[in-house]
Amino acid sequence: MAETVVLSKILHIRETEKKHAQKAYQQSIDLFEKTATQLYELLKKKEMAEEVYETALTESTTLDKLKEQFTYIEHLNNHIMHLQEEVQKARFDMEAKQSKLTDAHVEMKKYEKIIETRKKDEAAANRKKEKATMDEVSIYQFLNHKNR
């Protein structure tokens, strides 16, 4: 019984670790989604800017407007490259935290299984002991009854 109490305390610690890992994983998912959404919005802006630039090329537009639009597109490209790196980092972090969460879950399940097995063994030992006691009582009663 004392063994299962100790194991239950360890299980509680593992459950706490799992909750922390789950929270960290959720935060990493949120960060990834936020960064990916920013990248998506920036890609949409770039696409629209390129359409405006292409339209400006076909129409009679001043050279300054074309340079300005081209510079804007280059600025967007630089920002997109930076955000792509951020998305990759966020994805890597998210995958690492998912792995930690999986490991924490497996550890927790191990202790649950060990506790379950120990309790079953304990119950079987108690039943065996109870049966032996009942057999002993029956023999004692039989012998007492026979001696009368």
Question: What are these regions, as identified by a protein language model?
Answer:
Residues 1-148:
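Charge-rich amphipathic alpha-helical interaction elements
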